[in-house]
């Protein structure tokens, strides 16, 4: 039960952070759409897709709700969606690294008691989930983050993938 609780908490943190990083990268690269859609927030309900969240809790491999990007307004035009994805994945990787680096700080701050064991377990689970999330989201298919690549490079392919996003998501699950 404890492992499932850790994975639930890690999924909330990783999905929320990654969704926020996607929206922030899109905004910094010139697309205001995610900001207007309310995605530039740390609200997990804005970012988590139900199927992706359940898969994330069960296997530590998941995805966030797709972000609507306009490649024409992004810096880099056609490669803009790829830049947004890479920035967000780098942010998620940094989150995992930070969680891993906080373990000794927590241990020495709490003196190795049960509180530190719980928090260290949560940090380790979040770090592992973040790494697994980044690795799975490097696969260039929608609904995964790297699937945004197709929206800029080959819009017809991206449109087809977007249309069949749910069957693809269920296949990934």
What are the language-model segments listed below?
Residues 1-173:
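Hydrophobic transmembrane alpha-helices and their immediate loop junctions
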